[in-house]
Amino acid sequence: ALAINLANGNTGSITLTENITDFDFTNVPTNGVSTFTLQITQHASSSKTVAINQITVNGGGHVTAKTAGGGGYTVSTGANAIDLVTFLFLDAGTPLINALQDFS
């Protein structure tokens, strides 16, 4: 699991060394809109995966993030490819995801 505490800021980065099967967000404000942008850098030699269907917000149950058109999110697979993924929360609800992908 990738633990993300919004009390520590609203940006972060990770280089994939293993598959990410779930995200655990804490300290997401319960009133209004908040965001977290994550820079994901793909592994240099063997592609890893990122799942958005096992997300917890402030200790709640697992939810699947919503994406434009319901198409989901697939992390870029090229060696060292960079994705910028923004999670948008409204009142600490199910996150909406926007991704800019495959920077190289």
Protein language model regions, located:
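Short carbohydrate-recognition loop motifs
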Residues: 8-14
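Extracellular beta-solenoid/beta-roll
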Residues: 1-8
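Acidic, glycine/polar-enriched metal-coordinating patches/loops
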Residues: 15-104
